[in-house]
Amino acid sequence: ILEGTPGAGMGILLMLISLSLFVIGFTMGGLNYMITILQARTRGMTLMRMPLTVWGIFTATVLAMLAFPALLVSAIMMTLDKVLQTSFFMPTILKAGEVLEYGGGSPILFQHLFWFFGHPEVYIVALPAFGIVSDLISVHARKNIFGYRMMVWAIVGIGALSFFVWAHHMYVSGMNPWFGFFFATTTLIIAVPTAMKVYNWILTLWRGNIRIN
């Protein structure tokens, strides 16, 4: 890969190596989270009785286990492009009128791999926060969360849909218009479970025993 800015040499290589180590480390930690939630719950704690915070953490962990491998693969491919002069992401390039020895690569492939990780990553951050907000509202309204099962399925639905919206970051990349239409539609659909959560928060607060002191 051509060096264009200061730090684009060894700095980029170290960043790619650190990303790879991060994904490997998270995979071990993520498996720990998933197995603990599925196999080490206390007696009587069924899945549909777990706090919504735990549901948020569990769903976010599943998302990370599915999304981070795309980041790992893209980091490895970019490292190979940089070190071994492969052409995963490098198209044919002209330099001072001379064709460099690259060919067949696609920068768009890197965008797809990055955003396949990048958009679920938004919900990896957000879903545990949604769960915390749900439990805090329930505690301080002094009533059970409104529509608990609906809230659980909303968390799961947001997580599932997050894998079908990544290309809405790439509308100007020259993708097929029908491809763009599909991702625009899924982007609109993901607003439905999100709105369900907000309305359930409001209904939990409605006539709750809230004290501000």
Regions found by a protein language model. Give the residues of each.
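Membrane-embedded and interfacial regions of multi-pass energy-transducing membrane proteins
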Residues: 1-213
